Amino acid sequence: MRLKKITIILVLVLGSLLTFQAKASHMMGSDITWTCIGQDSFLIKLVIYRDCNGIPLSSASIPIKCATTGASITQVSIAKPPPVDITPTCGASCTRCETSSCAFPYGIEQYTFTKLVVLSSAGSCCKVTMSYSMCCRNSSITTATPGNFYIDALLDRCVTPCYNSPSFTNPPSAIICIGQNFVFN
């Protein structure tokens, strides 16, 4: 009986020494854009940038609400697409997105979620908000205290003709390599 207690205590002590660090700081950034397809029809695009050192990403859910009243118009669910490794590697042979044993300590994945949305059920609501939120914002984002990640976009569906949202021309991932020129437009 005494040997059993010693064994249990030994297992608990050794188990507490072999702890693993869980990182939930995977959200690096995001964009929500849309393309007008026709009357009340928009192709919604949500692009998410994930730190490969953090936890895996799941599917996306985008609530669409009337901006003036807060009333829900629809909820768009989109399955997780395959990621694209967009890590600038500075000549390294691998990234953290490929393997956790890579000597290069960084990795950035881009996920592009797209869905055709018809907003005819919005009625007289002209200004529509699309949003996305997820736990947890990356610790390298220093513009606010650590917490959840949130982004939204405002679309005026009553403008004729309908319009596309602005979009960025350069990818937002920037790792500046020592001794190499860097241009960010």
Name these PLM-found stretches.
Residues 22-185:
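Long, compositionally biased, intrinsically disordered segments
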